[in-house]
Amino acid sequence: RQMCIRDRYYLHMFAKEQPDLNWENEKLRQKLYEMINWWLDKGLSGFRIDAIINIKKNLDFPDFEPDAEDGLAACYKMVESAEGVGELLEELKNNTFKKYDAFTVGEVFNMKPEELPEFIGENGHFSTIFDFCAQCLSDGEHGWYDAPEIDFDTWRKTILGSQLETEKYGFKAN
């Protein structure tokens, strides 16, 4: 997005009023930890952390193939092609939540199944994560806005399968 005043740009994956933060910046991360710990010092016992998987991006800014008629590519491709989010999440946990034994729920929507133990449970980045398995059933060719019809049996099997897969490590929030 172009900023008229300085002829500079900033990245926002959501609303233009919500610029993405550069988690590669050590000073920024330390300030975030300071703010989180301030709340935990006040007695807050947990955090819901939305869109946390988006903190790591491919800052090489590759030119992705367009995936829409407007000639643009979806911003999630920038997150999918990034590596190293686990290191940032572990640093976040160790500098904040772990010190207070705080309960955390992470919004993690593109995790690979084999990564589940890294994300939840005793040694995971979070206490639990939201379960997006049923939401994935409603993604049509162009995302959630052209969702196909879902029958109850498919939905039930998907939820049950996700919970059975997760029980070895912890649980998922719904």
Q: Locations of the language-model features?
A:
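Intrinsically disordered regions, especially transient/low-confidence alpha-helical propensity segments
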Residues: 20, 35-36, 141, 152
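Conserved alpha/beta catalytic core and glycan-binding cleft of carbohydrate-active enzymes
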Residues: 89, 93-174
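Short, small-residue-biased leader/transition segments that mark boundaries at the very start
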Residues: 1-5
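Active-site neighborhood of glycoside hydrolase catalytic domains
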Residues: 23-114
